[in-house]
Regions:
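Structural signature of the two symmetry-related core transmembrane helices
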Residues: 79-93, 286-300
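Intracellular juxtamembrane helix-capping segments at the cytosolic ends
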Residues: 118-131, 324-337
């Protein structure tokens, strides 16, 4: 089934996943970081101070995600999605109205937990559970919401900040989230597989069984995959978090940097869709071990380049891996460990990802304050992804897909 026919047949569910992923933008680093300079100036914070606040809020988010993510195994996407959207709307409004520095860690926690954590988690778990044979396409399509937000929201809000006060723009974000609530409610009036009331569709994973989260943590493949799971979140988050400072040391304006983000997003969307197609066509094991190699080139280029053309090339390499990263890790949890406890297992993966996004900004901020430049840090990031690629390759070779037996307890359509 091609993409267009697939979308036409499943438009309501795919659009709901797209909207949830798009609204997650307001809790993502690429959005919050465009206000970094304003927030640091308003509250008189150094790079290390701001990085520490961001790290504290994000670490708290990662801790809560381990348990909160399991709610997607219990409640309808319609109910939990609406609840999280309302919470994110209130959190962005709180950022606009906040007068005190001590409130920042709490606000960052809410933005990161609801935006970065829960919304993409709900979207990806729903796509993985609702679709079986076309899981790759479903994940790729829903994840374009995140990619479009990453491309256009930083540019739009950076331009608006030239005219409007930064706090007023958080009110705009709040209104946008709130307006999506009735749309999600209508789109998911009839869910594809309402988890709490319908007969389940269960796809078993490695060794033909459903894995619990405890079993996953005890499995060696999990530990071989761990650097690859945490790495993109830590390193890519750091890149976007330090974008204002990075532009400054390269001699560019902030607007010149964010103007290149649409290029990044176009490439990310293309490779998001390609990875979804390749996942369904060739299987996860053939593409998973190699998808982080472009990140090696990206971060090494960020170390060397001094022109915007060079930066654009680096962003393209980064986008190739980022696009695939939107689809492949979620498919990994579903295919290797099954879908019966996918919400609980994926919550662990999301918590690890959120943990990485906490460590990255905090670490880079401290190192900058201590005189270790961001460009040198990016070179080390490139070497890190060589290491994670090697471990993925070893893990997939040892735990090969011929040990995976997919069984479907109650099949729906082939889609």
């Amino acid at each position: 089934m091609g993409y267009f026919e697939f979308i036409r047949s499943n438009i309501a569910w795919l659009l709901a996943g797209f909207i949830l992923a798009l609204n997650s933008s307001f809790g993502q680093t690429f959005f919050i970081s465009i206000f970094a300079g304003k927030i640091q100036s308003y509250f008189s914070l150094s790079h290390g101070d701001w990085g520490s606040i961001y790290m504290i809020g994000t670490l708290a988010s990662a801790t809560v995600m381990v348990w909160a993510g399991a709610t997607s195994d219990i409640f309808r996407t319609r109910s939990i999605g609406v609840l999280v959207l309302v919470g994110l709307s209130l959190s962005t409004l709180l950022m606009a109205l906040n007068p005190a520095v001590w409130m920042l860690p709490i606000i960052i926690f809410l933005l990161r937990f609801l935006g970065q954590g829960m919304l993409p988690h709900i979207s990806s778990v729903s796509m993985s559970r609702w679709f079986i044979a076309q899981r790759g396409k479903a994940l790729a399509i829903s994840n374009t919401g995140y990619a479009l937000g990453e491309a256009f929201l930083p540019v739009v809000f950076t331009i608006l900040m030239l005219t409007y006060h930064w706090q007023h723009l958080w009110v705009v974000a709040s209104l946008f989230c709130f307006l999506m609530v009735p749309l999600i409610w209508v789109l998911l009036q009839n869910e594809r597989t309402p988890q709490s009331i319908a007969e389940e569709v269960i796809v078993f994973g490695l060794l033909g069984k459903s894995w619990s989260r405890k079993e996953v943590i005890a499995h060696p493949l999990f530990w071989l995959m761990l650097p690859a799971i945490i790495g993109p979140s830590a390193c890519v988050t750091s890149f976007f978090f330090q974008q204002v400072y990075f532009a400054e040391i390269k001699g560019w304006t902030h607007l010149q940097l964010v103007a290149l983000f649409p290029i990044y997003t176009i490439v990310a969307i293309v490779f998001n869709l390609i990875s979804g197609w390749a996942l369904d066509k060739f299987g996860l094991d053939r593409i998973l071990p190699f998808y982080q190699i472009p990140m090696v080139f990206a971060f090494i280029l960020f170390y060397f380049v001094s022109t915007q053309i060079g930066l654009a090339v680096g962003l393209c390499f980064l986008a190739i891996s980022a696009g695939a990263n939107s689809t492949l890790p979620t498919a990994f949890w579903a295919e290797y460990y099954g879908t019966q406890f996918l919400g609980t297992i994926k919550a662990l993966g999301t918590a690890i990802m959120v943990l990485g996004s906490a460590i990255g900004p905090g670490m880079t901020g401290f190192l900058i304050d201590w005189g270790f430049g961001i460009e040198k840090q990016y070179f080390i990031f490139g070497l890190y992804f060589l290491f994670s690629t090697l471990l993925m390759y070893v893990g997939v070779k040892i735990y090969s897909p011929d040990k995976i037996v997919e069984k479907i307890a109650h099949p729906l359509s082939a889609a």
